[in-house]
A protein has these predicted regions:
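C-terminal ends and interior cores of transmembrane alpha-helices
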Residues: 162-176
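Helix-to-loop junctions at the C-terminal end of transmembrane segments
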Residues: 33-34, 140-153, 241
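Loop-to-transmembrane helix entry
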Residues: 9-19, 42-46, 119-138, 181-182, ...
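Multi-pass alpha-helical transporter architecture, strongest
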Residues: 51-64, 258-289
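Intracellular juxtamembrane helix-capping segments at the cytosolic ends
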Residues: 1-5, 196-210
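Helix-loop boundary and gating motifs at the non-cytosolic
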Residues: 92-131, 198
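A membrane-interface helix-boundary motif in multi-pass transporters
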Residues: 31-51, 239-269
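Juxtamembrane intracellular "pre-TM" segments in multi-pass secondary transporters
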Residues: 63-98
């Protein structure tokens, strides 16, 4: 974000390339049929490791982004990023911050259980079909500036959270027969689920944080969401999925009561949405530094 002049207009186009990476990864897994044999899944880590090494080397050639206080004295508080905590003094941002942590709990259900769910119910090429979600994400990233001008931060975030509710209801009641459309809708909603909440959240954080703490503020929200929120979410997803297993006569897991598994994140996301609607009053665009 330090490299752009207008985050609302430019960030979506930059973030789009990350989405393209997700699409390519899903297509590669499907093309190589790595899901069919659990023993072949080790190849996914080898491919990911090789690509990560290439990008690690490439990162040395990225544009120089010296810290705002380069060459100046800095305090320990600034070094460890504690100065970013001042953004929480803004009431609306504090509400958004808490909602972000909470919404990552149901988010973890998708990341941790969706592929298992689709494979378990018999969907062929689940990883490839899940990349439809990233294709949807690419479309909405392109449309982000248009939605920003018409909806603003609050309603962008609300639409994103509501999409999580609808997605999990689709998974709870969808099947490979007459409910197949619900499964595809649940996958395709990823564009709204992710872009309208998390990408909007990154831009909102950029708006309320001053230039001196912008990077620290982004690090703080990332730690809170993908650290704390996702940790709780993956623990909850594993516990709830484990409590809803279907066993054969030999005690082996053959399936899950997926309707019960998906209803929990649907209800949780609905609760977070209601709380956000009540306590986030309006969009604030101001620097804190």
């Amino acid at each position: 974000l330090n490299q752009v002049s207008d985050a609302e207009k430019e960030f979506g186009g930059i973030r789009l390339w990350g989405t393209i990476g997700w699409i390519v990864a899903g297509q590669v897994v499907g093309f190589l049929a790595l899901e069919k044999n659990p023993g072949d899944l080790v190849m996914t880590f080898k491919i990911a490791g090789a690509i990560s090494l290439v990008f690690g080397i490439y990162s040395f050639f990225l544009p120089d982004t010296p810290p705002p206080k380069a060459g100046k004295d800095v305090s320990f508080r600034e070094i460890v990023g504690l100065d970013a905590l001042k953004v929480l003094k803004i009431k609306n941002y504090a509400v958004f911050f808490i909602a972000s942590i909470l919404i990552c709990i149901p988010l973890a259900f998708y990341y941790g259980q969706a592929n298992i769910f689709l494979n378990e119910i018999g969907m062929q090429g689940a990883a490839q079909k899940m990349s439809l979600g990233q294709m949807s994400e690419a479309v909405f990233l392109f449309l982000m500036p248009w939605f920003f001008r018409r909806l603003g931060v609050k309603y962008m975030l609300l639409v994103g959270m509501l999409a999580w509710v609808v997605r999990y209801l689709c998974f709870a009641y969808g099947d490979l027969d007459s409910g197949l459309w619900m499964l595809y809708l649940g996958i395709i909603l990823h564009g709204i689920c992710y872009d309208f909440f998390f990408v909007t959240g990154n831009i909102y954080t950029d708006q309320v944080a001053g230039p001196q703490v912008r990077s620290s503020a982004q690090g703080l929200i990332t730690l809170a969401t993908y650290g704390l929120g996702m940790y709780i979410g993956f623990w909850a997803a594993g516990a709830i999925a484990g409590a809803n297993v279907i066993l054969d006569a030999g005690g082996e897991v053959t399936n899950h009561h997926w309707d019960k598994v998906w209803l929990f994140p649907a209800m949780f996301a609905a609760g977070v949405t209601v709380l956000f609607l009540l306590f986030f009053k309006k969009s604030e665009k101001q620097d804190i530094a």
